[in-house]
């Protein structure tokens, strides 16, 4: 008997995280991402060599998101529904690409090794390098910080522009000792990075119980001890006040989150937002301004926007 059923969605780079979320909601116990954009150059900008893409099999264009399901899951019936949801991403400003959905059986041994073909140490910012848990890595410069992740567990593994934009913003605002709330933590990468950069106590939340367990597992792989992970719907019911609030989620979810942030953000704090496709940036900025925020920083990469918002100063 085969151990897993793999459901593959052919899509675009910009839709990867949204498609990953669709598959997790459908019951996927693991997500694999193949993105041609990760293999377009031999080096990662100014941060040094990553690896030579010619030595690794990869897609020539586009992206694939592969969800791994228990074989008892009735995917034949779900396949059309998943395809419809993926095509529906167009109404949110995301290009779903071909949006084709295929099924295949995969044995446990194959699944356990497949991540190692596509995931290698990746320098993602000035100080941060993401390393898969099976690889030994030696820092290349003083002050470099390693984030150890299991990429077979959830999306948010650092290869997507939204994650890298958020990590660079974190580096720019953290001074040390802050309190932070990470809304929609996913793999826990932002919370882990924040503590490694000097943040004190961190509350990481996600509406998905599977994501909560995945974040907890990734946290155990790193030298961090001040992160609490809990299942929660955005900031509903949370009374903690924080110096930093971060959210790397789709614009459609950021809109209802923004009014919840203002009462929870301390004076002179920072609200960092990512997951914003470029043509949704105006909507998000307007919503922020309507709720008493101003934009301190704006960063862009690969058609995505990240923002650093602060509470407007009163005269």
From Swiss-Prot:
It comes from the Bacteria. The keyword S-adenosyl-L-methionine applies. GO terms for biological process: methylation. Its EC number is 2.1.1.-. S-adenosyl-L-methionine binds at residues 163, 184, 206, 248. It is found in: Cytoplasm. Keywords: Cytoplasm, Methyltransferase, S-adenosyl-L-methionine, Transferase. Gene3D superfamilies: Vaccinia Virus protein VP39 (3.40.50.150). Its main location: cytoplasm. GO terms for cellular component: cytoplasm. The keyword RNA-binding does not apply. It catalyses: L-lysyl-[protein] + 3 S-adenosyl-L-methionine = N(6),N(6),N(6)-trimethyl-L-lysyl-[protein] + 3 S-adenosyl-L-homocysteine + 3 H(+). It holds the Pfam family PrmA. Signal peptide: none annotated. GO terms for molecular function: protein-lysine N-methyltransferase activity. Belongs to the methyltransferase superfamily. PrmA family. HAMAP family: Methyltr_PrmA. PANTHER family: ELECTRON TRANSFER FLAVOPROTEIN BETA SUBUNIT LYSINE METHYLTRANSFERASE. This is Ribosomal protein L11 methyltransferase.
């Amino acid at each position: 008997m085969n151990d897993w059923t793999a459901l593959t969605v052919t899509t675009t780079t910009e839709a990867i995280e949204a498609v990953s979320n669709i598959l997790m909601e459908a019951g996927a116990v693991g997500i694999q991402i193949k993105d041609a954009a990760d293999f377009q150059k031999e080096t990662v900008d100014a941060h040094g060599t990553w690896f030579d893409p010619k030595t690794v099999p990869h897609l020539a264009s586009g992206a694939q998101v592969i969800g791994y399901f228990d074989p008892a899951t009735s995917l034949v019936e779900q396949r059309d529904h998943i395809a419809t949801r993926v095509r529906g991403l167009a109404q949110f400003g995301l290009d779903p690409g071909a949006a084709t959905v295929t099924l295949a059986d995969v044995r446990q041994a194959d699944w356990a090794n497949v991540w190692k073909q596509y995931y290698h140490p990746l320098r993602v910012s000035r100080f941060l390098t993401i390393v898969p848990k099976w690889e030994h890595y030696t820092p290349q410069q003083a002050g470099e910080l390693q984030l150890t992740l299991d990429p077979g567990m959830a999306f948010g593994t650092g290869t997507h522009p939204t994650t890298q934009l958020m990590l660079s913003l974190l580096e720019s605002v953290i001074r040390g000792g802050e309190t932070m709330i990470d809304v929609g933590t996913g793999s826990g990468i932002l919370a882990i990075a924040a503590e490694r950069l000097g943040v004190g106590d961190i509350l990481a939340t996600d509406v998905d119980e599977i994501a909560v367990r995945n974040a907890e597992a990734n946290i155990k792989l790193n030298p961090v001890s001040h992160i609490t992970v809990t299942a929660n719907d955005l900031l509903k019911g949370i009374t903690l006040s924080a110096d930093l609030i971060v959210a790397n989620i789709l614009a459609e979810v950021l809109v209802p989150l923004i009014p919840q942030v203002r009462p929870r953000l301390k004076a002179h704090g920072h609200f960092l937002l990512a997951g914003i496709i470029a043509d949704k940036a105006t909507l998000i900025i307007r919503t922020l301004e309507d709720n008493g925020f101003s934009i301190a920083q704006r960063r862009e990469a690969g058609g995505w926007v990240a923002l650093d918002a602060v509470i407007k100063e009163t005269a």
